[in-house]
Amino acid sequence: MAQQTPLYEQHTLCGARMVDFHSWMMPLHYGSQIDEHHAVRTDAGMFDVSHMTIVDLRGSRTREFLRYLLANDVAKLTKSGKALYSGMLNASGGVIDDLIVYYFTEDFFRLVVNSATREKDLSWITQHAEPFGIEITVRDDLSMIAVQGPNAQAKAATLFNDAQRQVVEGMKPFFGVQVGDLFIATTGYTGEAGYEIALPNEKAADFWRALVEAGVKPCGLGARDTLRLEAGMNLYGQEMDETISPLAANMGWTIAWEPTDRDFIGREALEVQREHGTEKLVGLVMTEKGVLRNELPVRFTDAQGNQHEGIITSGTFSPTLGYSIALARVPEGIGETAIVQIRNREMPVKVTKPVFVRNGKAVA
């Protein structure tokens, strides 16, 4: 039976259409996915992300452990609260999961991992943490609400006490701080400013209701997906998985190659891939009528006249832009245009960088 987050009752009271999402009953939308999408781009919306897993790591060798576990390097984290995005790779360089890691003290770090990968993530982390003597605590006692949009931080701040407001005021992106009952982080999955707030399960419903009263619109998984796709953000299982290199998923920037003597899981395989080349992730824009959908083939001819085929990993109609966009994994050598096969029609598409909207503005 699918699990329910502590906010399940709030979703039903708000009129949500609930669906099974990786064994969690989650809101798909509350009536209009388009309205929810636009609320985040123009004002403030919120998402229940309590299905994600928060994992606290403690021990004197925690930093050393994470420098081995992750492709990005937590040696970069020197200021308490600073966060880092990274892939957690297998030995062949495939992506077990993408996650965020927060640094608090030398013996205390926090991971936030995806819900669909929870069990394999915890198994992998536990297996590799043992030699380092790491204490692992899964924070199932916490719920998490993402408040996103140009007015999200101001509206959320009306619920904070003086100490919380003082600490988060002017906090830069990718930081997190614990103040009282709230863990407040300047992270998100929409391409907009906002907070991701973790708080005790028993306080989540009251906090959700207070956000509604503050003018924050409840949003479901549908809007979350169109928002993240516009922002060019990967979805695990679509842009990457255990068979796909981060180099083929626009995650090359998350691999810390320096220092060269740092050994991390998957490094050896990545070195070979970097030398010989991989596929790459690109953006596609189609202004013609129609919608680019997942798994449609993408065809192009390179400069030498050779024909190649890739695949759309995520595609949708963009509510912000008013036309269809997609992320596609394609061979090297793609030019500025390609062809996508939609049923029996060959549709021309423009090839772009894999990001379409940032802070409400078109970049594609």
UniProtKB/Swiss-Prot annotation:
It catalyses: N(6)-[(R)-S(8)-aminomethyldihydrolipoyl]-L-lysyl-[protein] + (6S)-5,6,7,8-tetrahydrofolate = N(6)-[(R)-dihydrolipoyl]-L-lysyl-[protein] + (6R)-5,10-methylene-5,6,7,8-tetrahydrofolate + NH4(+). The keyword Transferase applies. Its EC number is 2.1.2.10. The keyword Metal-binding does not apply. Keywords: Aminotransferase, Transferase. Pfam families: GCV_T (PF01571), GCV_T_C (PF08669). One of its GO terms (molecular function) is aminomethyltransferase activity. Gene3D superfamilies: Aminomethyltransferase beta-barrel domains, Aminomethyltransferase fragment, Probable tRNA modification gtpase trme, domain 1. One of its GO terms (cellular component) is glycine cleavage complex. It comes from the Bacteria. GO terms for biological process: glycine decarboxylation via glycine cleavage system. The glycine cleavage system catalyzes the degradation of glycine. PANTHER family: AMINOMETHYLTRANSFERASE, AMINOMETHYLTRANSFERASE, MITOCHONDRIAL. Belongs to the GcvT family. The glycine cleavage system is composed of four proteins: P, T, L and H. This is Aminomethyltransferase.
